[in-house]
Amino acid sequence: MENWSKDITHSYLEQETTGINKSTQPDEQLTMNSEKSMHRKSTELVNEITCENTEWPGQRSTNFQIISSYPDDESVYCTTEKYNVMEHRHNDMHYECMTPCQVTSDSDKEKTIAFLLKELDILRTSNKKLQQKLAKEDKEQRKLKFKLELQEKETEAKIAEKTAALVEEVYFAQKERDEAVMSRLQLAIEERDEAIARAKHMEMSLKVLENINPEENDMTLQELLNRINNADTGIAIQKNGAIIVDRIYKTKECKMRITAEEMSALIEERDAALSKCKRLEQELHHVKEQNQTSANNMRHLTAENNQERALKAKLLSMQQARETAVQQYKKLEEEIQTLRVYYSLHKSLSQEENLKDQFNYTLSTYEEALKNRENIVSITQQQNEELATQLQQALTERANMELQLQHAREASQVANEKVQKLERLVDVLRKKVGTGTMRTVI
């Protein structure tokens, strides 16, 4: 029996040494294994001691009780020993005749009990450390949750601010573009009305020229000269000469009036072209400012550069049109000067051929003026087409801005999905940390 108890203690010591060598494992696994092994070893020792007490009645019986820490309370109960000394009055000599092997077995048991107590203390300290670690992890988890909530709120606020700013910019730009388009349409309508009025006025002036003395217009200058040559009396000569002079003065006045009207019309067109150029320059400056602000807010847009190029090309075309109008004005001034020279040279009645040439020249000038007016009408049509293209560009820009707003909404949705994923991960980590229970030593 003694040899069996020694073998048990020896194997128990070997198991303890192997358990100490395996202490490099994680804290939680070590605590679980050590708790199980300690429970098993304590039961074996209690059974061993009870068996020995049954076989040796004269021997001192000892009962050991190991109390573990409860999961709710961290207080540690020390082990108590109950020594029940049973003395047999009729067999005192039997107790005196005990062998030294029994004494050594008792000392080994006491050593093992002391070792077990030390190990229990170590396990309790490790449990305390693990509880402290759990508390720290809970604090860190709460901090991370709070940070994630703050970041989510900040991102939501930023997204809301950006969307509001984009909506305001889109609304403001749309409003300005609508106003610009309406103003341009009004200008085009006014120019069209002015051109129609001028055409009507020219038609009326031509009708007036045609209706000057229709009876006298039927006669040519050659017929009037023939009448003067065939006239017998001085009264007929004076009458026919007065008719010729009156016709010349009337044609001269009509030509002067027509040239003055054309000059005033050209001056008005020049002023309108200059004002239009100034307006376009102001619009270009305003569009540049808008492009700068939009580039500061949204750097990834490149449509503004195309708009600037289109406006620059439009400005160049308008400058070229202005230069052409100025050249036409200079040409008309030169023509007026030449007409004045012709009027000063052809005051005499003897140069009938020169008068015919002058009349033909005036007719050619009328034709050229009509051609120039047709060119002006074509230029106005081109300007209307350019305005239509600008309106199409504004619509495309509006569509681009709507696409950008849609992309911003999609980005906000992606950010919300990421935040939801992070919240799910945090919930999973909480569940994992909450399900990890600590077992105590029994």
Curated annotation (Swiss-Prot):
Keywords of the record, alphabetical order, are: Chromosomal rearrangement, Coiled coil
Coiled-coil ranges from the UniProt annotation: 107-212, 253-435
Q: Where is the composition biased (Polar residues)?
A: 12-35
The organs and tissues expressing this protein are described as:
Expressed very weakly in heart, liver, skeletal muscle, kidney, pancreas and fetal kidney. Not detected in brain, placenta and lung.
Molecular function via GO: identical protein binding
How is this protein annotated for GO cellular component?
A: nucleus
Looking at the record, which segments are called Disordered? 1-39
Clinical disorder: A chromosomal aberration involving MIPOL1 is found in a patient with mirror-image polydactyly of hands and feet without other anomalies (MIP). Translocation t(2;14)(p23.3;q13). MIP is a very rare congenital anomaly characterized by mirror-image duplication of digits. MIP is occasionally associated with dimelia of the ulna and fibula, tibial and/or fibular hypoplasia, nasal abnormality and other malformations. Most MIP cases are sporadic, but very rare parent-child transmissions observed in familial cases suggest an autosomal mode of inheritance.
Name of the protein in its database record = Mirror-image polydactyly gene 1 protein
Report the source organism.
Homo sapiens
